[in-house]
Amino acid sequence: MAYSKKVIDHYENPRNVGSLDKKKKNVGTGLVGAPACGDVMKLQIEVGDDEIITDAKFKTFGCGSAIASSSLVTEWIKGKSVEDAKEIKNTEIAKELSLPPVKLHCSLLAEDAIKAAIADYKQKRENKKDS
């Protein structure tokens, strides 16, 4: 199976690798995995007071397509509103990276990780209001 140039670029030069402080109230963390292949993806977002994502980081243990999907979405979501980021679909990720059908689950993981990070952020925000 041949990877596209974009997958190879994001795999060899991943963007935004690392972690944010998950204790911060404006940081949301999404941790997702694919039991079928063993890929695990952690994606974190940092959100400003205006609900714009100011930073995004990821750590992914998996194949080149999983790493490339993570790297790409961290670039895509920076500067977007939380609501706009939530609308990113795995099909858009797969199309951008020219993922073969056997690797579509990697783009789905990235979509799920975004949604999980946003849900975590929103939960923290609600808890902050209650305290």
Swiss-Prot record:
GO cellular component: cytoplasm
Disulfide bonds: none
A Pfam family it matches: NifU_N
One example of a Gene Ontology biological process annotation: iron-sulfur cluster assembly
GO molecular function terms attached to this record: iron ion binding; iron-sulfur cluster binding
InterPro entries: ISCU, NIF_FeS_clus_asmbl_NifU_N
Function statement: A scaffold on which IscS assembles Fe-S clusters. Subsequently gives the nascent cluster to other proteins. It is likely that Fe-S cluster coordination is flexible as the role of this complex is to build and then hand off Fe-S clusters.
Quaternary state and interactors: Forms a heterotetramer with IscS; each subunit of the IscS dimer contacts an IscU monomer.
Family: Belongs to the NifU family.
The protein, known as: Iron-sulfur cluster assembly scaffold protein IscU
Organism: Rickettsia prowazekii (strain Madrid E)
